[in-house]
Amino acid sequence: MTALVSPAGPEQPSLRVRRLLLHTQHQPVVVMHTDCHVCRSEGLAARSQVLLTNGARQVHATLFQVDGDAVLSHDEVGLSETAWDLLGVAEGDEVRVSHPPALESLASVRRRIYGHRLDAQALSEIVRDVAAGRYTDVHLAAFLTASAALPLDENETADLTGAMIAVGDRMEWDAPTVVDKHCVGGLPGNRTTPIVVAIVAANGLVMPKTSSRAITSPAGTADTMETLAPVDLDLATLRRVVEAEGGCIAWGGAVHLSPADDIFVRVERELDVDTEGQLIASVLSKKISAGSTHVVIDIPVGPTAKVRGEDAASHLASRITAVASRFGLAATCVQTDGSQPVGRGIGPALEAFDVLAVLQNASDAPDDLRRRAATLAGAALEIGRKAGKGEGTALALETLADGRAWKKFEAICEAQGGLRAPPRAAHVHPLVAPRAGRVVHINNRKLSRLAKLAGAPESKAGGVHMDVRLGDEIDRGQPLLHVHAETTGELAYALDYAARAGDIVEIEA
């Protein structure tokens, strides 16, 4: 979210600012006295949207009110930390508070709620207002829900993608081929990106990877990578890292490549929704803005993955490639096994330990993660003509085995601010098999829920460590998994859910 910079409007009464040290995540909030003369003259009430003006800087915020003089006097306005930072004020400065201009693009949101398709202009207006911070979480939820109830068609998806690109920065690289990769998600522990970037960059291709934080999963790539190295890179730092090492693994929200998407993601996380059209627009807007020419898309398919069957995966792949082609981006979609978690760790730090094990060729490194990363890296190497058709996976495995991938990963981490050790949880508790038998099913959705209740991704060390895989023969009382938590409260939440959730790991006698 950014502050608007615009000419000052008609002179309005001013109020002295007070910093409340109130943390409201990304949403600017202001607090005013119920008897404040501005509230009376402007007709402002609690939860009104207000426009704050400090010189040329303007911020849209949500108003809350207080009685009495214990918190604020009648001539003061209290600011949350987000509002304070966006306005760029100092204690005692004066700002103007007024009604904001009418939010015209909401008419298009209402049309979408009632089942009407939106054209490029309508979507562009919505996205511009979202990026400018004019949409509240209620407005955002309405748009996202309407886009889920009546899924975006191909034209809407392409128009939304273009609108999201238009409000952000774009990068260009002095290379004929710039590769990227993305996983559509829904599969716990599938942390291939750091490995893929290391392999691809070690072979001389350019891969400026910007990744998101978790939306509905226990960890996103940025969450995991953050336990190993800084990911909040500004545009200049990102460019320096890529020019020096050929690749990076950075948080996309820090570089303003698709700022509207970062706002959408925050509300999608709270709604626990991730629809096809929004997913495609989110992924492609960031890849195109990052200057990519080619992208490999990992689509895990499984009974409890995000994509349940091959027909659905083929439809998604077709839609991705069709929309990407409108922007000159070549997309290669790879269907992968989504029947069970990848690797052993689920949660930022636990997944980071798996990544390190694969890159360092540890004897106990999860082989499924190694092979999946090699498959995806191989596709990128073939696209970039570093390997012949059908030979990319072998080159990727060779790059891991001879240590070049680990050396490149170390160099990327150092360039981003330094390699560090992931944290370990203070509390670890096993969930054991109630009977002997064979593991026949692992519920990815329940497993992700368990890891999130254990604190992931906010608690970096929280999550789940898997001890079994499909087909394993196990004894009664043998650990199926271990829950990792940073606090006793998070551990209790997770264990309570595990007791009520039914079979997370299904055993057949």
Curated annotation (Swiss-Prot):
It comes from the Bacteria. Pfam families: Glycos_trans_3N (PF02885), Glycos_transf_3 (PF00591). Signal peptide: none annotated. GO terms for biological process: pyrimidine nucleobase metabolic process; pyrimidine nucleoside metabolic process. Gene3D superfamilies: 1.20.970.50, Nucleoside phosphorylase/phosphoribosyltransferase catalytic domain, Pyrimidine nucleoside phosphorylase-like, C-terminal domain. Keywords: Glycosyltransferase, Transferase. GO terms for molecular function: 1,4-alpha-oligoglucan phosphorylase activity; thymidine phosphorylase activity. Its EC number is 2.4.2.4. One of its GO terms (cellular component) is cytosol. It is an enzyme of class 2 (transferase). It catalyses: thymidine + phosphate = 2-deoxy-alpha-D-ribose 1-phosphate + thymine. HAMAP family: Thymid_phosp_2. Belongs to the thymidine/pyrimidine-nucleoside phosphorylase family. Type 2 subfamily. This is Putative thymidine phosphorylase. It comes from Chelativorans sp. (strain BNC1). The lineage of its organism: Bacteria, Pseudomonadati, Pseudomonadota, Alphaproteobacteria, Hyphomicrobiales.
